[in-house]
């Protein structure tokens, strides 16, 4: 049985969206147990009876404006901290939260702990592509600054995830750069390129540009945390902007446009689905001793459900256990 600790109080729509997502996951997956951390009375309002779910009551939670490290150290009984502690103590196999991102990163590092020989765990997410296959990208903001050695490790981490969780046999690794030529980039990008090209265990395809990411140019894209976070928010904003612009144009263009939209309804739904990344799950703080997964702060029940599904696959494939062995053998 796979045991997943869930911070029921984190996120804009907690606890309703969190608990409703848990309800659906419990109904669909008979091999998981859920531990809900938070206000018991509020949780019970939305929770369906199930013998594979338990509530660990706490009145304390970490707020969105709390300073991350200070909150983790001072709010020992916060729902997020208790979930991470359950993983450390072996009472849970993974932890999920839609709460304060910085605090969850701190909890992952300070409570759960990183895998030996991994210098800087990276925040990784699955992002949408036009063909619907998606790609993984890291780091998405766990670290403001990175070295070439960190980015090399991210390529290994991302490749492992793509193989074991997404089922990509030979993941194509791309280095995000300002051009595809081998001579492009600043010193960080050039040094990283050399390390990736020299690693025969990776299917490194070279530099990739941001404009090509949604065209499935690579299965895993590696970059520093600052750049990755900016790209992530650009993709999110573009996807939302396209859909809003379509809605506005149809509404303002009159009857003909509305009739045309009706005829194109299935195609428009396909477009919406191709830009919707909620079905891909959450962002993984990869490189820790157990899965620590972050849902978007505005996650609905669907997103929570798919994040639990994602964690279940990670536990089923033992991707973290394989990483521990891999980096133990590398010793770098």
Curated annotation (Swiss-Prot):
Name by which UniProt lists this protein: Phosphate acyltransferase
Superkingdom of the organism of origin: Bacteria
Keyword Lipid metabolism: yes
UniProt pathway: Lipid metabolism; phospholipid metabolism
Keyword Metal-binding: no
One Gene Ontology cellular component: cytoplasm
Main location, first listed in the record: cytoplasm
Xref: SUPFAM superfamilies: Isocitrate/Isopropylmalate dehydrogenase-like
Subunit details: Homodimer. Probably interacts with PlsY.
NCBIfam families: plsX
Pfam family, one: FA_synthesis
Single biological process term from Gene Ontology: fatty acid biosynthetic process
Function: Catalyzes the reversible formation of acyl-phosphate (acyl-PO(4)) from acyl-[acyl-carrier-protein] (acyl-ACP). This enzyme utilizes acyl-ACP as fatty acyl donor, but not acyl-CoA.
Reactions catalysed, as given in the entry: a fatty acyl-[ACP] + phosphate = an acyl phosphate + holo-[ACP]
GO molecular function: phosphate:acyl-[acyl carrier protein] acyltransferase activity
Protein family (similarity comment): Belongs to the PlsX family.
Gene3D superfamilies according to UniProt: Isopropylmalate Dehydrogenase
Enzyme nomenclature, EC number: 2.3.1.274
């Amino acid at each position: 049985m796979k045991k997943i600790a869930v911070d029921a109080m984190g996120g804009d729509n907690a606890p309703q969206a969190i608990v409703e997502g848990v309800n659906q996951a419990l109904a669909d997956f008979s091999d998981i147990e859920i531990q809900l951390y938070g206000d018991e009375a509020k949780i019970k309002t939305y929770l369906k009876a199930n013998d594979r779910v338990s509530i660990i009551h706490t009145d304390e939670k970490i707020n969105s404006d709390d300073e991350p490290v200070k909150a983790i150290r001072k709010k020992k009984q916060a729902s997020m901290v208790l979930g991470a502690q359950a993983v450390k103590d072996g009472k849970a196999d993974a932890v999920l939260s839609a709460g304060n991102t910085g605090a969850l990163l701190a909890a992952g590092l300070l409570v759960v702990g990183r895998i030996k020989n991994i210098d800087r765990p990276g925040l990784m997410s699955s992002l949408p592509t036009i063909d619907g296959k998606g790609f993984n990208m890291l780091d998405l903001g766990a670290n403001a600054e990175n070295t070439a050695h960190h980015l090399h490790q991210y390529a290994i981490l991302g490749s492992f995830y793509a193989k074991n969780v997404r089922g990509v046999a030979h993941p194509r690794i791309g280095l995000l750069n300002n051009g595809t030529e081998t001579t492009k980039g600043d010193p960080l990008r050039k040094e990283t390129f050399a390390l990736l090209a020299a690693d025969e265990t990776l299917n490194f395809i070279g530099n990739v540009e941001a404009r090509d990411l949604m065209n499935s140019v690579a299965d895993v894209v590696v970059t520093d945390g600052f750049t990755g976070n900016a790209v992530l928010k650009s993709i999110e904003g573009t996807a939302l902007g396209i859909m809003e612009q379509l809605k506005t144009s149809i509404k303002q263009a009159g009857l003909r446009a509305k009739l045309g939209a009706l005829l194109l309804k299935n195609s428009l739904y396909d477009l919406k689905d191709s830009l919707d990344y909620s079905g891909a799950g959450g962002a993984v703080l990869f490189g820790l001793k157990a899965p620590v997964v972050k849902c978007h702060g505005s996650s609905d029940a669907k997103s929570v459900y798919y994040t639990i599904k994602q964690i279940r696959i990670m536990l089923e494939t033992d991707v973290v256990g394989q990483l521990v062995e891999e980096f133990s053998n590398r010793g770098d």
